[in-house]
Design a protein with these regions (language model features):
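Conserved nucleotide-binding/hydrolysis micro-motifs of P-loop NTPases
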Residues: 16, 76-77, 100-102, 136-140, ...
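Inter-motif core of Ras-like GTPase G domains
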Residues: 79-102
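Canonical P-loop GTPase G-domain recognition
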Residues: 138-172
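Conserved catalytic network of the ASCE P-loop NTPase/AAA+ motor domain
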Residues: 2, 46-49, 59-64, 84-89, ...
Length: 172
């Protein structure tokens, strides 16, 4: 029997921060390697209601078939029970922070919510693989006020010290 390793990675962050756009970009970029369709359950106004799900096969490493399952959670606070459900069995996290200046407080609240939801599964945010994505960095070119990387680091990552990167989910 073939040995298989499944890895569940959850994209977490405030509503309209770019979680779904990340998965759509990955789906488009790696279409040839992804045999399955991306599953999205949307609500009014094209917002994620339940979750997005993108399964794909990375290939083989040391005789093990590696399967990755990417999920997003709904960003809106009213769907917190769904967020907890999606976090069950998580192996790693990408926290997608919205770089827009006016989203500063939402980022902080969303990260706090992630910590609390992980605790319901007796998981500690300090003991789980986590990467910070500072999204929408491209908006500065359009004259939209964005937070500096230093501010995002201070607000979200001063204690966690997780790896971080700047990004634009629409551009990759």
């Amino acid at each position: 029997k073939k040995k298989e390793v499944q890895v569940k990675i959850v994209y977490y962050g405030p509503g309209r921060g770019g979680k779904t756009t990340n998965l759509e970009y990955i789906n488009q970029k790696f279409k040839k390697r992804i045999q399955n369709e991306m599953v999205t359950v949307k609500t009014y106004g094209d917002r994620t209601l339940f979750f997005d799900f993108l399964p794909f096969d990375i290939g083989e490493i040391k005789g093990h078939s590696i399967k990755v399952q990417l999920y997003t959670v709904p960003g809106q606070v009213k769907y917190n029970a769904t967020r907890r459900l999606v976090l069950r069995g998580v192996d790693g996290l990408v926290f997608v922070a919205d770089s827009m200046d006016l989203r500063r407080e939402m980022n902080i609240r969303s990260l706090q919510n992630l910590k609390e939801n992980l605790e319901t599964f007796n998981k500690n945010i300090f003991n789980i693989p986590l990467v910070m994505q500072y999204n929408k960095r491209d908006l500065e070119e359009e004259g939209i006020p964005i937070l500096s990387t230093d501010t995002l680091q201070k607000d979200l990552n001063s204690r966690l010290k997780a790896p971080y990167f700047e990004a634009s989910a629409v551009k990759g």
